Amino acid sequence: MSDINSWCASVLKRVQWQEADTFECSNDLQRYWLLGLDSLSRRLEQHCNVLSVSVLDNTHVNPDKLTVEEEALLSGEVCLRRKVILKGDQQSWVYGRTLIPLSSLQDQPHDLTRQGHTPLGITVFSAQSAHRDKLQVGTIMTERGELFARRSRLWMNNKPMLVAELFLPEAPIYSKEVES
């Protein structure tokens, strides 16, 4: 699992991010997956029998390990870093990397440090005040082909976290079928 973790992390670092409102989606399928402001996990669930999570990392990181952009969107404090692979019917679909400031973990209805194999989006978007902002989208050419990615800030009970998602080659975003 560490090989895919390293590969995905290095790919995400090379993405050239664009604001969502300036990103040119080629079709409705890309728009559906990249620009949705609701739970990606819920969308993925609709395209498989079993959505599962493989946890790659769930550790604290110091602010000096964050990028300048990440620090600007968060409070410059120690964060819980969660890295996962979201799988649809055992196929790796999305690599997710979430940074949750320790202050955002306090006074929440769920203990996000013990999220385990539950998709974070399911938990976050079950909160009444959950929403997403600062959505950015990008592509990156890899040895596995061109891949899409997105990143945004999620708010749960008025507390921020950052999530970056890399759509892996088997993800439904690359399906030849058009969404209805």
Curated annotation (Swiss-Prot):
Its EC number is 4.1.3.40. Substrate binds at R82, L120, E165. Its main location: cytoplasm. It holds the Pfam family Chor_lyase. It comes from the Bacteria. It is found in: Cytoplasm. One of its GO terms (molecular function) is chorismate lyase activity. One of its GO terms (cellular component) is cytosol. It catalyses: chorismate = 4-hydroxybenzoate + pyruvate. Keywords: Cytoplasm, Lyase, Pyruvate, Ubiquinone biosynthesis. Pathway: Cofactor biosynthesis; ubiquinone biosynthesis. InterPro entries: Chorismate--pyruvate_lyase, Chorismate_lyase_/UTRA_dom_sf. Coiled coil: none annotated. GO terms for biological process: pyruvate biosynthetic process; ubiquinone biosynthetic process. Removes the pyruvyl group from chorismate, with concomitant aromatization of the ring, to provide 4-hydroxybenzoate (4HB) for the ubiquinone pathway. Belongs to the UbiC family. This is Probable chorismate pyruvate-lyase. The lineage of its organism: Bacteria, Pseudomonadati, Pseudomonadota, Gammaproteobacteria, Vibrionales. The gene is ubiC.
